[in-house]
A protein has these predicted regions:
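Conserved hydrophobic "DFG−1" position in protein kinase catalytic cores
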Residues: 9-10, 17, 87, 102
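NUDIX/MutT-family hydrolases
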Residues: 82-84, 93-124
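Conserved Nudix-box catalytic region and its N-terminal flanking loop in Nudix hydrolases
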Residues: 14-53
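Conserved N-terminal beta-strand and adjoining loop/helix that marks the start
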Residues: 1-16, 36
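Generic C-terminal helix-cap and adjacent flexible tail
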Residues: 125-130
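Active-site-adjacent beta-strand/loop module that shapes the phosphate/pyrophosphate-binding cleft
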Residues: 58-59, 68-91, 101-105
Length: 130
């Protein structure tokens, strides 16, 4: 099973959403920044590393707010661990995505998110978490 971390970066009641490029797996889908946990790496360390690589920030990783195991149709599974990020150093810069966007909870529903993220997106929009 693939193990992944993702960040819920919050600023002024907005959440950062990121769109994959057309050259990535599941092109042009929206997601939260993050990535694969490497062998022997702790989830919080992976979260800090991914945010530095993808957005150029040094993040203070907050609480783990959700853990989802998703089975993809046709095979393959992923464990996603979502962490809240309220504080970070540096200015966010888009290093790998087609687009990054600060959105309200309700605006999340209008973006074409990865299937594995949909339950969390619905919970965020409904105010059930964070």
């Amino acid at each position: 099973m693939k193990r992944v971390v993702a960040a819920l970066i919050l600023k002024d009641d907005l959440i950062l959403a990121c769109q994959r490029t057309r050259h990535q797996v599941m092109p042009l889908k929206w997601e939260f920044p993050g990535g694969k946990i490497e062998e022997g790496e702790q989830p919080r360390d992976a979260m800090r590393r991914e945010l530095e690589e993808e957005l150029g920030i040094v993040a203070e990783v907050g609480a783990e707010v959700a853990r989802i195991i998703h089975e993809y149709p046709g095979g393959g599974s992923v464990e996603l661990r979502f962490f809240e990020i309220h504080k970070y150093q540096g200015e966010i810069e888009n290093r790998i995505f087609r687009e990054i966007r600060w959105v309200t909870r309700k605006e999340l529903l209008g973006l074409d998110f990865l299937e594995a993220d949909l339950g969390l997106v619905n919970d965020l929009a409904a105010g059930k978490i964070l």
